[in-house]
Amino acid sequence: MDEKAAPGSETAIFAGGCFWGVQGVFQHVKGVSKAVSGYTGGAKDDAVYETVGTGRTGHAESVEITYDPSKVTYGQLLQVYFSVAHNPTQLNFQGPDSGTQYRSTIFAENDTQKQIAQSYIDQLDKAKLYPAPIVTTIETGKTFYPAENYHQDFLTLNPTYPYIVYNDLPKVANLKQLFPALYSEKPVLVLSASN
């Protein structure tokens, strides 16, 4: 099940650990025009990195992806999300980061996205592609709040930062290897070079 390809733009919001790596992956997907790091699941007043980091806000570090469904479908974005961007079997942690703010969650923008995401998870569960159960949740009706500017484009701007080298650059390499038709060498950036 996937959405019908239509010109224009749609948004998808995925959470899967630290947003630096998730953003970095989706910035390299053809058909994506923007991938913004932020917070989803909690209140606006709590959408601040230091507060979200407590794990008590309901927010997850997330990425809002703007894409052209005639170039890349929601289903293809889900494939990248589950195969490259994070490990969907880890409950409330990814790599070295732990807490509910690092949970694996799809924030569906509408009923169609919710149905596609649930169908995809069901297919993965049935195929038993992972050594452990998928713990990814689907939430609806949540507002996305952009993160602070210093979190935007972090992977691209800090390619030698040890966390990025160890945790996130391999994800971009896996995207290129597993989905060469979707891979774009040049990332779409949130901030201009002057910021």
UniProtKB/Swiss-Prot annotation:
Q: Which InterPro entries match?
A: Met_Sox_Rdtase_MsrA_dom, Met_Sox_Rdtase_MsrA_sf
This enzyme catalyses: L-methionyl-[protein] + [thioredoxin]-disulfide + H2O = L-methionyl-(S)-S-oxide-[protein] + [thioredoxin]-dithiol; [thioredoxin]-disulfide + L-methionine + H2O = L-methionine (S)-S-oxide + [thioredoxin]-dithiol
Q: Which residues cross the membrane?
A: none
> Which EC class does it fall in?
oxidoreductase
Q: Which GO terms of the molecular function aspect are on file?
A: L-methionine:thioredoxin-disulfide S-oxidoreductase activity; peptide-methionine (S)-S-oxide reductase activity
Q: Keyword check for Oxidoreductase, yes or no.
A: yes
Residues at the active site: C18
GO BP term (any one): protein modification process
Annotated family: Belongs to the MsrA Met sulfoxide reductase family.
Q: What does the UniProt record say this protein does?
A: Has an important function as a repair enzyme for proteins that have been inactivated by oxidation. Catalyzes the reversible oxidation-reduction of methionine sulfoxide in proteins to methionine.
PANTHER family recorded:
PEPTIDE METHIONINE SULFOXIDE REDUCTASE, PEPTIDE METHIONINE SULFOXIDE REDUCTASE MSRA 2
UniProt name for this protein? Peptide methionine sulfoxide reductase MsrA 2
Organism field: Mesorhizobium japonicum (strain LMG 29417 / CECT 9101 / MAFF 303099)
